[in-house]
Curated annotation (Swiss-Prot):
Protein name per the record: Small ribosomal subunit protein uS8
Organism listed in the record: Spiroplasma kunkelii
Keyword Transport part of the UniProt annotation: no
Family per record: Belongs to the universal ribosomal protein uS8 family.
Encoding gene, per UniProt annotation: rpsH
Task of the protein: One of the primary rRNA binding proteins, it binds directly to 16S rRNA central domain where it helps coordinate assembly of the platform of the 30S subunit.
Quaternary structure note: Part of the 30S ribosomal subunit. Contacts proteins S5 and S12.
A molecular function (GO) term: rRNA binding
Length: 129
């Protein structure tokens, strides 16, 4: 049985966000931590922390403005059955720059803006708006 851990992460965030939960907990991985760093840097989550010794857990503290959700939507783009790769010219712009695309490049995981600035293409992991 194969599970898409990034899709699972996005689904957990989406579900907790819809229910206005303060935080969401999930199994940790290096890729998930890097995505959490990007979400924090871009202002979509308040904070995150990794805890545990053997089985590490990633806890994201979600961000709200009153009762308004900061994250309007999350969408997994590249899936295990259908990978989506783009060149630097094809790097997508989410909602005319109002959202972000998370891209895995040979220099690491970064936003669409950082990938364009570094003149890199790669695998489009997800859209966040």
């Amino acid at each position: 049985m194969m599970i898409d851990t990034i899709a699972d992460m996005l689904t957990r965030i989406r579900n907790a966000n819809q229910r206005l939960h303060k935080s969401v907990k999930m199994p940790s991985s290096k890729m998930k931590v890097r995505i959490a760093e990007i979400l924090k840097k871009e202002g979509y989550v308040e904070d995150f922390k990794v805890s545990g010794d053997i089985k590490k857990d990633l806890t994201l503290t979600l961000k709200y403005k009153g009762k308004t959700k900061v994250i309007s939507g999350l969408k997994r783009i590249s899936k295990p059955g259908l990978r989506v790769y783009v060149t630097v010219e094809e790097v997508p712009q989410v909602l005319n720059g109002m959202g972000i695309a998370i891209i895995s490049t040979n220099q690491g995981i970064m936003t669409d803006k950082a990938a364009k600035k570094a003149h890199l293409g790669g695998e489009v992991i997800a859209y966040v708006w």
